[in-house]
Amino acid sequence: MREKKPYQVLTFHTTDAAMEMESFCKQNGIAGQLVPVPRRLSAGCGIAWRMEAEVYAQYQTVIADCGIEVEQSEALVF
């Protein structure tokens, strides 16, 4: 069985915003990936950006200042 890890999950109102976050993070070397929104959360578009909690802690300010509207930001364990 794989060990569970803490992740930060960002949800968005639109698919465009989710895709913008993916592009922004890749351009800035921020590790993460697009995933379906976990059942515990709800989001307008159904797509979320997931990154390890440590990565989010390191880049939280950069992400907040990037200009992409985030609907929710939740810490979850997968």
What are these regions (language model features)?
Residues 14-31:
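Short amphipathic alpha-helix segments
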